[in-house]
Amino acid sequence: MPESKYRQQTIRAPRGATLTAKSWLTEAPLRMLMNNLDPDVAENPHELVVYGGIGRAARNWECYDAIVDALTRLEADETLLIQSGKPVGVFKTHDNAPRVLIANSNLVPHWATWEHFNELDAKGLAMYGQMTAGSWIYIGSQGIVQGTYETFVEAGRQHYNGTLAGRWVLTAGLGGMGGAQPLAATLAGACSLTIECQQSRIDFRLRTRYVDEQAATLDDALARIAHYTRAGKAVSVALCANAADILPELVNRGVRPDLVTDQTSAHDPLHGYLPTGWRWEEYQEKALSDPQGTMQAAKRSMAAHVQAMLAFSKMGVPTFDYGNNIRQMAKEMGVENAFDFPGFVPAYIRPLFCRGIGPFRWVALSGDPQDIYKTDAKVKEIVAEDKHLHHWLDMARERIHFQGLPARICWVGLEWRQKLGLAFNEMVRCGEVSAPIVIGRDHLDSGSVASPNRETEAMRDGSDAVSDWPLLNALLNTASGATWVSLHHGGGVGMGFSQHAGMVIVCDGTDEAAARIRRVLHNDPATGVMRHADAGYDLAVECAVEQGLHLPMVAATQRKR
């Protein structure tokens, strides 16, 4: 039977406290795999695409069926191995080993190109896992809302005396990641104009309240933005158009936004960025009939897009790359100064990473939103003094639409992750929530990624491209007993530009789970503090000392013998 990437099937994760697998440690990855393909979550579930161009949850439908069958049958002392979305083996391990180990999209560096990957993909030998698509912990656009919110808030602190009121953000892309931008801007107090070339994506964001309004034309959009900024209102506006047309036009008109960024799927020129003048259907057809020509056309449009961003930057508008590698694509097309504006991590986020603060997330396997609201309250109780975090949780409850199983994103660091995990496990044990909770994170975290054009751009010691760190993170999480661990290549910025690791752990209310949580939710963020301390960041060294880390080559953390 030929392998199929298309099936007209609606998948939703089971809800409630009844198991379909043999334990919660195997039920959890089963439900989260299915949740990734829920039509309320995934961008194109019938083709197994979760987000980010062609980021898939399984290699093909036959592999999906086999994964579901394997997880249903998996014993408490067995581990399932997934190779680029394909279940390749079940092995006897032990009770505290991960139940699933995942490796997606990894290629020997010399061959780590889109061209070679696409050849393998066409032969059914590989799958692009993005970050949380192939690692089964995607929670919809909420997963990046807080990180984007924190970025915008910090930009307001740095450039506009601490407030974005009466300001507006210009950006593009309303896909799985980019769709978070308008809501994040609104929560940060700013208006936003987001350019998106697919009407279906705008419709989805309007329906889920991530976007407030759609403008009919550019003039209409600018009039709305002018009206709302004068009134001091934070309203998000979408425009169906091509960013490679609109941004240069805005430059020509002398329009001056207050912040400029971008979250189109520029990391994947074959599937993720519509060339100017093309229809989406034409783009899809030519991706098959003329892949090289299609990629070149997309990159030419990206070059025009980046040149406009450079022009805004030259005007003095704070302009930053939001991690889609569009600067690299433009540079390959001859825009030699493409990197004259920074990425968002060195510009705004790195101090958080130095303290192990990153995108901690959890999901209620029950499917009951009340379980998330109860955990929100528990977070406020434990992290009692962080009013900024409390404000985020209040806004999230009011504005964020759950996609699939109810979930929450909450940026916390080394000091708090273990404490929160243990508290959630106790809530499960006592019956305060109606079923177990899974805790995971984005691969975009402080110690789990090497990505010189994004998370590890401009490291103090020049170690941007050293990818030992995510490998060590994956190995340590495996040794610590995470429920499933993943190691991917190419997420966010595309083939050849990143390696990254993920972990998920189940809170099932048992003492054994508590022991695993103590190890995993300390060690995982501690690798981020370690990585930044090793690179020479004083803030990370201070955090390492405060949290009692032993880093043999960092003098301040030496243990007295």
Curated annotation (Swiss-Prot):
The keyword Lyase applies. The active site is at residue 410. It is found in: Cytoplasm. Gene3D superfamilies: Urocanase like domains, Urocanase superfamily. One of its GO terms (biological process) is L-histidine catabolic process to glutamate and formamide. One of its GO terms (molecular function) is urocanate hydratase activity. Keywords: Cytoplasm, Histidine metabolism, Lyase, NAD. Pfam families: Urocanase (PF01175), Urocanase_C (PF17392), Urocanase_N (PF17391). Its cofactor is NAD(+). It catalyses: 4-imidazolone-5-propanoate = trans-urocanate + H2O. Binds 1 NAD(+) per subunit. The keyword Cytoplasm applies. One of its GO terms (cellular component) is cytoplasm. It is an enzyme of class 4 (lyase). Its EC number is 4.2.1.49. Pathway: Amino-acid degradation; L-histidine degradation into L-glutamate; N-formimidoyl-L-glutamate from L-histidine: step 2/3. Catalyzes the conversion of urocanate to 4-imidazolone-5-propionate. Belongs to the urocanase family. This is Urocanate hydratase.
